[in-house]
């Protein structure tokens, strides 16, 4: 073969081969801090693994998998995605990933032993996985090469908020890849009512998401919402609007009102018909109020749906992102369950023995929500009190970042020197 032919052939091969690696990175950003690994491992992935084991395992069970032929005793196990993998038996995830897809990499790491296939749709405002030359493209290629990752998983260059329009490209993708077992909304912005930026797009998009999920999902699913909360810029009027379901519960549910008084100022809801009295709220109490209000807003939507849905807050956390401004990230987790009841024959004509299925009432859900908000844990305090845990998380995060093209030793040094960024 002549040189011209060789070059021509090389070009074809290079175009077809996915790019997996780029030069190592040495600059680390706020979301590379150990506390983010805590959230991934302790909240997102632990809760997902629990749901797989308890509820989803059978529905995610695939036909017998094909194993690669080059395995040896010492070789890493690899799985070839078979052509007969059932699409409706994949763990379907909706995410808002960064350019390195660290959340998806971590999810795969922590649930791969459960032998389920992951299929994901990601929204990234800057770049999509089909755009060659971007880190998102490289990262997506690397993730797709992992065992049990469905090959059409992708990241599209769009905002999650765009799904609020049913005519948008984003909503079209939402339908194509759903319904979802896991929705992880790791937001760059804030759902906390504030005077800096309007939050209505987030609420509209989340409402649209729930409409879609309620119409198409028939099993329990997880919703993670990570949002910035900055009490110093609270929009009192918008907070009052968000708290409408909360105020109604205070008026109608004595147990709920009593529970709120254990961690919020007593005079806050003294006149539920008027605006909430925010005068004596501390910053921590405003964060708790927002947690309750957002949870009650979601619960109201669940109760308005037909059939209704039960929602429960799972273990949730907060951590500081700007001590001077009192800003924190609130990482909330919710499990949503459809209230589907089988038809029971009360005449005795049918011989099936079916007990009427009972679900928690709205009042019971509201009370448990208030209790869960009160139990939100501070990640900074947890890590400060447990050096061994922080060390383990640092090392596991270093492994994750190294797989994504970062220099491991540089990351360890960065953590040991206080995790400072250019904005500090």
Which residue stretches match the model-derived regions?
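A conserved mid-domain beta-alpha-beta active-site/ligand-binding segment of alpha/beta enzyme cores
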Residues: 243-339
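C-terminal target-recognition/interaction regions appended to catalytic cores
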Residues: 3, 8, 340-424
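Local beta-strand N-terminus motif with an aromatic residue
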Residues: 90, 179-180, 220
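Conserved beta-strand signature within the Rossmann-like core of class I S-adenosyl-L-methionine
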Residues: 215-231
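A short acidic, Gly/Pro-enriched loop at the edge of an enzyme's catalytic core
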Residues: 168-182
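Short, flexible/disordered intra-domain loops and linkers
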Residues: 131-136, 167-169, 192-203, 236-241
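A short, conserved alpha-helix within the catalytic core of class I
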Residues: 164-166, 189-213, 218-219
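SAM cofactor-binding core of SAM-dependent methyltransferases
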Residues: 9-171, 348, 361-387
């Amino acid at each position: 073969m002549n040189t011209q032919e060789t070059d021509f052939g090389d070009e074809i091969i290079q175009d077809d081969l996915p790019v997996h690696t780029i030069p190592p990175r040495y600059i680390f950003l706020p979301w590379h801090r150990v506390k983010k690994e805590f959230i991934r491992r302790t909240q997102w992935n632990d809760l997902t693994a629990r749901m797989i084991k308890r509820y989803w395992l059978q529905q995610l069970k695939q036909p017998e998998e094909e194993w690669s032929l080059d395995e040896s005793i010492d070789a890493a196990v690899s799985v070839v995605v078979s052509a007969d993998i059932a699409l409706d038996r994949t763990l379907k995830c909706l995410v808002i990933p960064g350019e390195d897809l660290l959340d998806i990499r971590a999810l795969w790491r922590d649930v791969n032993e459960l032998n389920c296939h992951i299929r994901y749709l990601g929204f990234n405002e800057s770049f999509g996985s089909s755009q060659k030359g971007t880190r998102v493209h490289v990262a997506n290629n690397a993730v797709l090469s992992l065992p049990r990752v469905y090959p059409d998983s992708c990241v599209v260059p769009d905002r999650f908020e765009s799904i609020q329009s049913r005519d948008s490209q984003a909503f079209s993708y939402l339908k194509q890849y759903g319904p979802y077992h896991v929705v992880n909304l790791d937001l760059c912005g804030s759902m906390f009512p504030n005077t800096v930026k309007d939050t209505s797009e987030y609420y509209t998009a989340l409402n649209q998401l729930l409409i879609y999920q309620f119409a198409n999902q028939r099993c329990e699913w997880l919703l993670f919402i990570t949002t910035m909360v900055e009490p110093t810029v609270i929009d009192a009027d918008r907070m009052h609007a968000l708290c409408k379901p909360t105020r109604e519960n205070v008026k109608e549910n004595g147990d709920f009102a009593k529970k709120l008084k254990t961690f919020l100022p007593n005079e806050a809801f003294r006149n539920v018909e008027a605006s909430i009295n925010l005068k004596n709220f501390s910053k921590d109490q405003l964060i708790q109020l927002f947690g309750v209000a957002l949870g009650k807003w979601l619960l109201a939507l669940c109760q308005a749906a037909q059939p209704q849905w039960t929602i429960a807050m799972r273990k949730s956390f907060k951590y500081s992102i700007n001590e001077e401004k009192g800003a924190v990230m609130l990482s909330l987790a919710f499990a949503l369950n459809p209230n589907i009841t089988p038809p029971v024959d009360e005449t005795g004509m049918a011989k099936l023995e079916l007990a009427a299925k009972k679900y928690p009432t709205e009042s019971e859900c509201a009370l448990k929500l208030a209790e869960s908000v009160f139990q939100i844990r501070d990640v900074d305090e947890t890590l400060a009190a447990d050096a061994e845990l922080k060390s383990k998380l640092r090392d596991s995060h270093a492994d994750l970042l190294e797989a994504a093209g970062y220099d491991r030793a540089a990351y360890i040094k960065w953590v040991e020197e206080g995790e400072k960024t250019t904005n500090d």
